[in-house]
């Protein structure tokens, strides 16, 4: 059995962690960083880039670089690359595959299982899609865990067995959650959770982009939003400025050659953004965090004085305005001993350990973030499971028909808090037919909701009279069938083989270039010691390598390198022989000097002996 890891699949960055000796370790990626940008790019040569390498080339490959795809997961969004449509699951799977690969390189073992985290306020379709992304990446997804719960698990287990109430304020790159949890004696229980799936650091970045666009338009009369490359450069500069403003009072944004004017003259952008101005243009975003915060306190039925610890999660909580607001709302200083970028992945690794039996005496009790119900007469939302119900859970309720002799019922499943069903999120629908003819109100239809530990919903309907039953595992328009998942897994595996082959080919080319260069350099440095015919042969072999490198035939390159290697061995042999001959000539010269009558042999006199003679 392979190893299990914990993965924080983030909007802007992702992290992977593993249990070693009972302790969670965050794994550095192949570039040496502990966080991996959640960016995927399709290079023009067919290579798929993931992480920092994808982020680095975004400006020159805007249309084929995908970032923040987590904001689309669970929807029917697709992107068309080379006449092929990619779903958010497939793009997310690329990031997961890189994390898996980097973990395997670190561990020296296969990674087969994973606990993947999601925002607490993710609805069913988003959770299902995240699980599918894991499957496409070749992972057995042990559990989908809420990010604040994972963070509290990592934080709480370090605090021992004393009971405590923890408020987790999680502001990531694309989503926001706030959760209240009770931890004690190995039990982590979520009391309430709320959030906003469309609020995160990306929105703060966008405000800086908008500010820069307005400034540039006012000064230069040019709208930068019409230039995709310029917008990408603005995005990258905005993110850097936001980070800089967390520790400085101002940030200078200088982008030379950002675009050209109508006469093709280059234009430059140079602006200074103060922290005060930044907070002013993003104040409404900050205010949006207050409603979920107040909702959680209300739902949990607690006063703020009963909260023992406040934990900040997500890189966006590093903004001073965010931590100041949290302190203002809670009356407590947020805990500084937690790395907001890594704590979620650490908690996920601990949960993986719990599920694999490697961590004992820990129980995680999560909740469903939104109410679940069905549409009943008049379009009313009839809730079967209220929000903040501990999962896994199962609930049944009996309904009846609205018309005489109604042969079937349509079960429409919704998720949300609004009173009318149409105002909530439709998760799916199915039909229960074969109902025995009867006056309205007589048939008894039992509807059962079942939520598993991943927060994924199944619904069944049963006619009590006939025993006829129908079940649906919620899978809306964005859901993938098992056949589609299997196809995507094979596609991902094929790409992995292609990528491996491409890497090997590039390594062969690099080695060939290096061998040719080093051989020529060696000949130049030792030219006077090497025979002309050998130099000619080696030069021809090196030329053959250079010629092969111009083509795409990897076997031809390998063959040319092999031939050059054989000829190069003769270089070493010839140089050795030349040095030996030179040494012999020097020895002969020394011998001649020994027989010269003009050379006087010196007598060595021991100083002590000389003194004795005196």
From Swiss-Prot:
Residue ranges annotated as compositionally biased, kind Low complexity, are: 581-602
Which interval of the chain is the signal sequence?
Answer: none
Q: Where is the composition biased (Basic and acidic residues)?
A: 491-510
Modified residue annotations for Phosphothreonine: 175
> In this entry, which stretches build a coiled coil?
none
Q: Which PROSITE patterns match?
A: HSP70_1 (PS00297), HSP70_2 (PS00329), HSP70_3 (PS01036)
Keyword set includes Transcription: no
Q: Tell me, using the record's free text, what induces this protein.
A: By stress conditions e.g. heat shock.
Pfam families given for it? HSP70
**Where does the source fall among the domains of life?**
Bacteria
Region Disordered: list its residue ranges: 491-528, 581-614
Q: Which SUPFAM superfamilies match?
A: Actin-like ATPase domain (SSF53067), Heat shock protein 70kD (HSP70), C-terminal subdomain (SSF100934), Heat shock protein 70kD (HSP70), peptide-binding domain (SSF100920)
What Gene3D superfamilies does the record tag this protein with?
1.20.1270.10, 3.30.420.40, Actin, Chain A, domain 4, Substrate Binding Domain Of DNAk, Chain A, domain 1
What is a GO molecular function of this protein? unfolded protein binding
Task: State the protein's purpose.
Answer: Acts as a chaperone.
Report the sequence similarity comment from the record: Belongs to the heat shock protein 70 family.
Its protein name is Chaperone protein DnaK
Source organism per UniProt: Corynebacterium aurimucosum (strain ATCC 700975 / DSM 44827 / CIP 107346 / CN-1) (Corynebacterium nigricans)
